[in-house]
Swiss-Prot record:
Molecular function via GO: aminoacyl-tRNA deacylase activity; ATP binding; isoleucine-tRNA ligase activity; tRNA binding; zinc ion binding
GO CC terms: cytoplasm
Highest rank taxon of the organism: Bacteria
Motif 'KMSKS' region mapped to chain: 624-628
Domain notes from UniProt: IleRS has two distinct active sites: one for aminoacylation and one for editing. The misactivated valine is translocated from the active site to the editing site, which sterically excludes the correctly activated isoleucine. The single editing site contains two valyl binding pockets, one specific for each substrate (Val-AMP or Val-tRNA(Ile)).
Function text: Catalyzes the attachment of isoleucine to tRNA(Ile). As IleRS can inadvertently accommodate and process structurally similar amino acids such as valine, to avoid such errors it has two additional distinct tRNA(Ile)-dependent editing activities. One activity is designated as 'pretransfer' editing and involves the hydrolysis of activated Val-AMP. The other activity is designated 'posttransfer' editing and involves deacylation of mischarged Val-tRNA(Ile).
Organism field: Rickettsia prowazekii (strain Madrid E)
Family: Belongs to the class-I aminoacyl-tRNA synthetase family. IleS type 2 subfamily.
Protein name in UniProt: Isoleucine--tRNA ligase
Location within or outside the cell: Cytoplasm
CDD domains for the chain: Anticodon_Ia_Ile_ABEc, IleRS_core
Length: 1086
């Protein structure tokens, strides 16, 4: 008679990558992703923003990590009843696209691009930005991330760009924009300024060695200075110096040709150092560093005055380039000058330093900037014209030496900002730009930030909060080509000034009388009109050349993606801010920040309510993943080898989701370990269920009515795990959710299934056996739904299998044009087409038996600790031991499970005691990190008292040295007395077990019998016998086994479904060793 099989034939050794490919086909052919959205029509929505990547490069592990996190919460919120639209987006404008195009076209720089043609250049950018779009879709789909590519928004689309124009005009109307010439970080390689936050992205700072030089400036007012000194000292008229020189130190010698002032600290002490009728002025704290250069012995006494006394003195320019510049070449006191590196005197070049510009402008000194867009000196510095500034340092030093102004050159190692696109060192340079007045509303951003739930939580007030507190005005214009043009037109005649700012295509079309098909340059640049404010009619309104900083466009994503306010106005108002957003932690200076700036300025609301800042992924040695270093595998290769679920678990169960680093090896060993230790145990439970349910022709059902103690326990653990997963994901904590899954399957496999094997294996198909199958089925089905967002493809496979459908069979049906019946979403439905169309399980009708869980967990703890002791003492599990002594206050509960404990750890007797003090003492372990912060001055006394045992447990808490410790400041650990062997603590260090390790001859014989059972079971497996086959057994041994067979023969036969016989032709023969004695084992199927 053929058995009825209710489940697919499931292999224990499965190719998870191949299974995942079948799952992807099933989802695509059956349109599961779209159904997961459609089935939730009418439900409340969960909104998350998909940060737009560039498509001119392949995705890396960082992109995949972010994608995994997005997918987990989108899937989870869907099965929690939310409608979750998932729209992909592309960042298209900006430097990444331009630099790639320059490389491909073989051109470089603004002049070369202009000569090539802006239209042709931008057309190339337009094509190149989507170069890898299909590859992106391949990677994203393979990682099992559900997202809509067909309706993806692009920042280069006309509708998106129009929303950006609207935002700009709104800011303009709110008086939150201004134009100014200010010193900014400047990329001479890209010929564009950068925002201050762009210098904080990723590893923008690099260690760099520069030449730092000290130069002397000759002061003009010799008589005046002599007078200042003589007021403070006994100096006589004949002691007057002929020349005074003030020493300044700089790490940027190339800025010295543009020097216009010097700055000193008001309260800093400055020394007058005499050397050969020349007096050098330097901060007193820096004199020792210049002893050699100034010829000092170290025994000299110097006149000292405060820096404020030097204010107003003038000096001779180092060079004659700007010698007639008004109000220049004077000394000013300022608070930003500090002692430390250098001389305590700072040279001011207002065209190349932000502090320099602010100070000089306050003194009526206009800046000069003799460096062009490519970082080369202009004709204002004729002897350096065309020289790149960094290449000019040595030439300048030589000239200073020739002039007698040079004092010293040093090699100075410091962290210096580099361009995030070209990796070239930045310069600071005055450039004209449009700015958002962030400083005007930064306090409001700080307030709105308190409404956001940040993960990790300390980002709110530290990494992001402090950044907001120190926010500066944001430069949003770039003198580049491929980007949304600033909608600003100016009169070309300063006699008739006028500025027009446009916030829509309609406004532009109305004023210029043309149809706008493309907002990009050069088409938009060609739009001109007569200046309405010019009565002569001769001046013309022309658009300024600049385009938007691409970060402004990224920050406009919430409204730009839906063409707000020109379309979807009601939808946007109802769906803003987003419920969720995720990117890596540096985006606190990037996308998160620009979203916050624009959301606050435009809507006075935070842009999102929950935000995960994940960490970065590095190679196994802690280095950044790099094509050049070849230190990471192509993700697709990893997917094809281990599957993407394994990589998902590896990443999202690690600390990287808490903002820390994740080191991943190139060979994928870490991912393989995840497969082996996390996913395979889940599969093993599924495999066990299907193979034995099919063998017994039994079908499992969702049923929680069994009163079997193991069933009640595992179902209670199931509900606890389901609740924990829900709680964790509600709190945006995948790490804890994955731990809950792993912990549950550890108990399911290594406790419930193992302790229930006799129920599954027995011949009778009674209620107890059916309850076991129902319980295991219920655990698998409920957990499959609960963990479906965490392990989407393996969960789908198991879910389908539990409904007697192999994914391969489904795909065959679909390929033949046969459709699967779609069941409506309903809690009462036993089956939906996909696990991802189910509702999250609540198990509301089942009550957790907490008392049983607590007791059984202690039983499990006792057994696992006992087995660990056996392993440590090299005593195999099949070797029986005489007894275990359990010393606990909860022995009454444990006694109900005495037989289970005896069987599990293989002991004959369990002894219960409660006199713990006779076997162990409690040792106080202090949490130094927490306690040290609260009681730093008492720590030494507390440590000494803890070592001496001078503490007391009171009703108020643990008392020591006159203090009551908080529960998180200490732990009490049971420490068994040294003469007692075979011990372990359990029940949170409140109880002790002692395993009797003495072996008698009787115990040894029984251990041999159990070994023989194991040998026979292994032979059955190798002979490929079915689990139900009965067999003949013959044992041929070098030593006499008759006593063992006489005493334990029935036990051996029962365990192996065998009968002892001789003189038969075996199906399988094996040779094994029992305590160094050879045994030949023969088996034959009956």
């Amino acid at each position: 008679m053929t058995n009825t099989k209710y489940y697919p034939d499931v292999s224990a050794n499965v190719d998870f990558a191949a299974i995942e490919q079948e799952i992807l086909k099933f989802w695509q052919n059956n349109n599961i992703f779209q159904k997961s959205i459609d089935y939730r029509n009418g439900e409340s929505e969960f909104i998350f923003y998909d940060g737009p990547p560039f498509a001119n490069g392949l995705p890396h592990y960082g992109h995949l990590l972010t994608g995994f996190i997005k997918d987990v919460y989108a899937r989870y919120k869907t099965i929690k009843g939310k409608k979750v639209e998932r729209r992909f987006g592309w960042d298209c404008h900006g430097l990444p696209a331009e630099m790639q195009s320059e490389k491909e076209l073989g051109i470089s720089g603004r002049i070369a691009i202009t000569n090539f043609g802006i239209e042709k250049f931008n057309n190339h950018c337009r094509a190149s930005v989507m170069q890898y779009a299909s590859e992106w879709e391949q990677y994203v789909t393979r990682q099992a991330r559900w997202v809509a590519f067909k309706n993806a928004y692009k920042t280069m689309d006309k509708n998106f760009m129009e929303s950006v124009l609207w935002a700009f005009k709104e800011l303009y109307n709110k008086d939150l924009l201004y134009e100014s010439m200010r010193v900014m970080p400047y990329s001479w390689a890209c010929e564009t300024p950068l925002s201050n936050f762009e210098t904080r992205l990723d590893n923008a700072y690099r260690e760099r060695t520069d030449k730092a030089i000290t130069v002397s400036f000759v002061l003009n007012e010799v008589t005046l200075i002599n007078g200042i000194i003589s007021q403070k000292s006994d100096m006589k008229e004949g002691d007057n110096f002929k020349e005074y020189r003030i020493l300044a130190w700089t790490t940027t010698p190339w800025t010295l040709p543009a020097n216009l002032a010097l700055a000193v600290g008001s309260d800093i002490d400055y020394a007058f150092v005499d050397k050969n009728e020349v007096c050098y002025i330097i901060a007193a704290s820096s004199v020792a560093k210049y002893a050699k250069e100034l010829g000092l012995s170290g025994k000299e006494n110097f006149e000292i005055i405060k820096g404020l006394k030097l204010q107003g003195l003038s000096y001779k320019p180092l060079f004659n380039y700007f010698e007639n510049h008004p109000n220049s070449f004077k000394i000013f006191a300022s608070d930003f000058v500090v002692e430390g590196d250098g001389t305590g005197i700072v040279h001011m070049a207002p065209g190349f330093g932000e502090d320099d510009q602010i100070l000089c402008e306050s003194k009526g000194i206009e800046l000069v900037c003799p460096v062009d867009n490519s970082g080369k000196f202009t004709k204002e510095i004729p002897d350096l014209e065309g020289v790149q500034v960094f290449d000019a340092n040595d030439k300048i030093i030589i000239k200073l030496k020739e002039q007698g102004n040079w004092i010293k050159t040093e090699q100075y190692i410091h962290n210096y900002p580099h361009c995030w696109r070209t990796d070239t060192p930045l310069i600071y340079k005055a450039v004209p730009s449009w700015y958002v007045r962030v400083t005007k509303f930064k306090d409001r951003m700080v307030e709105l930030n308190q409404q956001i739930n940040w993960i990790p939580h300390n980002v709110k007030d530290n990494l992001f909060g402090k950044w907001l507190e120190n926010a500066r005005d944001w430069s949003i214009s770039r003198n580049r080509f491929w980007g949304t043009p600033l909608p600003v037109w100016k009169s070309d005649d300063p006699k008739y000034p006028r500025i027009d700012v446009y916030g829509s295509i309609e406004e532009i079309e109305k004023d210029f009388g043309v149809k706008i098909n493309d907002l990009h340059r050069p088409f938009i640049d060609e739009l001109t009109r007569t200046n309405p404010d010019d009565p002569t009619g001769k001046s013309t309104m022309r658009r300024i050349d600049d385009v938007f900083d691409c970060w402004f466009e990224s920050g406009s994503m919430p409204y730009g993606q839906v063409h707000y306010p020109f379309e979807n106005k009601k939808w946007f108002v109802e769906h803003f801010p987003a419920d969720f957003i995720v990117e890596y932690s540096s985006q606190t200076r990037g996308w998160f920040y620009t979203l916050m700036v624009l959301s606050t300025a435009l809507f006075d609301r935070p842009p999102f309510l929950n935000c995960i800042c994940h960490g970065v992924i590095l190679d196994a040695t802690g280095q950044k993943l790099s094509k050049r270093l070849n230190n990471y595998a192509d993700p697709l290769e990893l997917f094809d080898k281990y599957g993407s679920d394994a990589l998902r678990v590896t990443m999202l169960s690690s600390n990287v989701v808490k903002g820390q680093e994740l080191l991943i090896d190139k060979d994928g060993k870490m991912v393989f370990d995840t497969l082996r230790l996390f996913i395979k145990p889940i599969w093993n439970a599924y495999h066990f269920f299907t193979i034995y349910a099919n063998a017994d022709s039994l079908k499992g059902t969702l049923n929680f009515a069994s009163q079997n103690v193991l069933d009640v326990y595992i179902l209670s653990k199931l509900k606890i795990a389901v609740n924990k997963i829900e709680e964790s994901l509600d709190n945006f904590d995948t790490q804890t959710a994955y731990h809950a899954v792993s912990e549950f399957f550890e108990v399911l496999n290594n406790w419930y299934i193992r302790r229930s094997r006799a129920r599954f294996w027995k011949n009778e198909k009674d209620t107890d056996k059916q309850n076991a199958y129902n319980t295991l089925y219920s655990c698998l089905k409920i957990m499959t739904i609960a963990m479906s967002a965490l392990i989407p493809m393996i969960s789908e496979t198991i879910y389908q299998g539990l409904h007697n459908t192999a994914i391969t069979q489904l795909n065959c049906l679909l390929s033949e044009g046969k459709h699967i019946v779609q069941n409506p979403m309903s809690d009462t439905q036993d089956y939906n087409t996909s696990v991802h169309l189910c509702n999250y399980p609540t198990l509301s009708d089942f009550e957790i038996n907490y008392e049983l869980v607590s007791t059984m967990d202690n039983v499990l703890d006792i057994c696992s600790n006992s087995l660990f002791i056996r392993s440590t003492e090299n005593i195999r599990v099949r070797q029986p031991l005489a007894c275990i002594t359990i010393i606990s206050k909860h022995n009454n509960n444990l006694k109900d499970f005495e037989d289970l404990i005896k069987d599990e750890i293989n002991v004959k007797t369990v002894i219960y005691r409660d006199d713990l003090e006779n076997y162990a003492r409690k040792k106080l372990s202090l949490n130094f990190a927490i306690l040290g912060k609260r009681l730093p001055h008492k720590m030494k006394a507390i440590i000494d008292a803890a070592k001496k045992g001078e503490w007391e447990a009171t009703t108020l808490g643990l008392a020591i040295c006159g203090e009551i410790l908080n529960s998180d400041e200490y732990t009490l650990i049971l420490e068994p007395y040294s003469h007692i062997k075979g011990t372990a603590n359990f029940d949170n260090n409140s109880s002790l077990l002692i395993l009797n390790l003495e072996l008698t001859s009787e115990l040894i014989e029984e251990g041999y019998a159990r070994d023989i059972v194991r040998f026979i079971q292994y032979a059955r497996k190798e002979a490929d016998f079915s689990i139900t086959d009965r067999i003949l057994i013959e044992i041929i041994s070098e030593f006499d086994l008759s006593k063992i067979i006489d005493h334990y023969g029935d036990f051996i036969k029962e365990q192996t479904l065998g009968e002892f016989a001789k003189n038969f032709t075996p199906d399988y023969v094996s040779k094994v060793a029992l305590e160094n004695n050879q045994i030949q084992l023969k088996v034959k199927r009956l």
